[in-house]
């Protein structure tokens, strides 16, 4: 059914090449579209998402996308297992995106003030960390989806954001008190702040570091400790995340070469989370691993680098197919994992988006693999780059 309004407002992640944009309807930043016009590439959509655009107003008459009415207002007919996730909707999605963007902006402001030698106040970041924890309890999967959105040129802030989200998720799974989760989340947001002291030629080197350069890189942990220990409002737990996330069980970590029982629960948690996010991230000099590959790295390091029990629990809390993972279904369609299924981990709720043999995007469909009578199942995980898919458009 065609929308009754000629200029519907849609979430930016529904924007497709062929749609004609006439205005930004809502956003988190101050960016404005220089000129209205036809969207011709997915890269244009990516730019809008990265700059904080949340919704856009589309002109149906001037759009050139076949079946645009169906894209904006999907057909009410659903196959077996089709779902509308509980608590879903544009309002919830926009709220969570705003929270994510607000945290990113506050991170940037904190770092700018540090570099300029200006007074710093963690109160706004502490407030957003508390809101992130609250959201993890109500819409945790949606938060984890945002942790899959990455840009190679923004690694430092995105890595810290993701570590914060992953620590909140891990801590919730372990049953930690909310006050502790808030500290871990804020510690994650600030855990790599000392890298502002690391020379860019070392921090962003497109290749393997020399021994001397690696020594310089290691100093970021000391810098983080020095900065945060002199910042009002920083707790011992937050300091521990920043100072100890590179320590390892066998004493091969840094900077203090702590060993065994010297590594607290929070240190062990932050080490696991930091490595998981780092190896799954795309960098200028390397392609990120898929989550299942990252799990293998963690499992390979148990009892040497990582606590075996905690690694097992981390993998369980993330799920066999972590939220935000692109998977191939048994009918050659690609889907993004959107919600975990703790009772049946192999059957999450997914969002179907693409056909691999016909090589084209599909009308987005939510599908609960536990409720489709076995009609479809996951065959494998897929690297989005193989099909030129940007997950930011679908999570």
At which residue positions do the language-model features occur?
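Histidine- and acidic-residue-rich, metal-dependent catalytic cores
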Residues: 93-94, 98-395
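Membrane-cytosol interface segments
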Residues: 1-120, 376-395
């Amino acid at each position: 059914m065609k929308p009754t309004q000629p200029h519907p407002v849609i979430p930016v992640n529904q924007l497709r090449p062929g749609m004609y944009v006439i205005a930004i309807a809502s956003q988190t930043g101050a960016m404005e579209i220089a000129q209205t016009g036809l969207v011709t590439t997915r890269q244009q959509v990516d730019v809008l998402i990265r700059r904080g655009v949340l919704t856009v107003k589309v002109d149906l008459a001037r759009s050139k996308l076949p079946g645009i009415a169906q894209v904006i207002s999907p057909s009410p007919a659903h196959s077996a297992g089709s779902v509308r996730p509980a608590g879903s909707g544009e309002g919830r999605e926009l709220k969570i995106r705003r929270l994510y963007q607000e945290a990113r902006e506050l991170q940037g402001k904190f770092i700018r003030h540090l570099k300029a030698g200006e007074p710093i106040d963690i109160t706004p970041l502490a407030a957003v960390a508390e809101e992130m924890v609250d959201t993890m309890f109500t819409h945790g999967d949606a938060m984890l989806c945002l942790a899959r959105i990455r840009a190679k040129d923004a690694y430092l802030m995105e890595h810290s954001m993701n570590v914060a989200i992953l620590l909140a998720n891990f801590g919730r799974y372990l049953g930690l008190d909310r006050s502790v989760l808030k500290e871990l989340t804020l510690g994650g947001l600030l855990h790599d702040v000392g890298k502002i002291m690391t020379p860019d030629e070392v921090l962003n080197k497109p290749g393997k570091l020399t021994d001397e350069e690696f020594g310089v890189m290691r100093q970021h942990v000391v810098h983080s400790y020095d900065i945060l220990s002199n910042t009002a409002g920083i707790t011992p737990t937050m300091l521990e995340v920043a100072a100890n996330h590179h320590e390892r069980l066998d004493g091969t970590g840094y900077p203090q070469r702590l060993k065994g029982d010297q590594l607290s629960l929070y240190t062990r948690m932050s080490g696991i989370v930091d490595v998981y996010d780092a190896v799954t991230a795309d960098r200028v000099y390397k392609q990120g691993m898929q989550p299942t590959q990252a799990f293998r790295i963690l499992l390979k390091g148990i009892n040497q680098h990582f606590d075996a029990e905690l690694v097992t629990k981390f993998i369980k809390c993330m799920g066999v197919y972590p939220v935000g993972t692109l998977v191939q279904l048994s009918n050659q369609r690609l889907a993004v994992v959107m919600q975990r299924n703790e009772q049946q981990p192999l059957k999450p709720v997914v969002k179907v988006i693409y056909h691999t043999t016909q090589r084209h995007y599909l009308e987005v469909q939510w599908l609960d693999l536990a409720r489709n009578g076995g009609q479809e199942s996951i065959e494998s995980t897929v690297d989005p780059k193989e099909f030129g898919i940007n997950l930011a458009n679908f999570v």
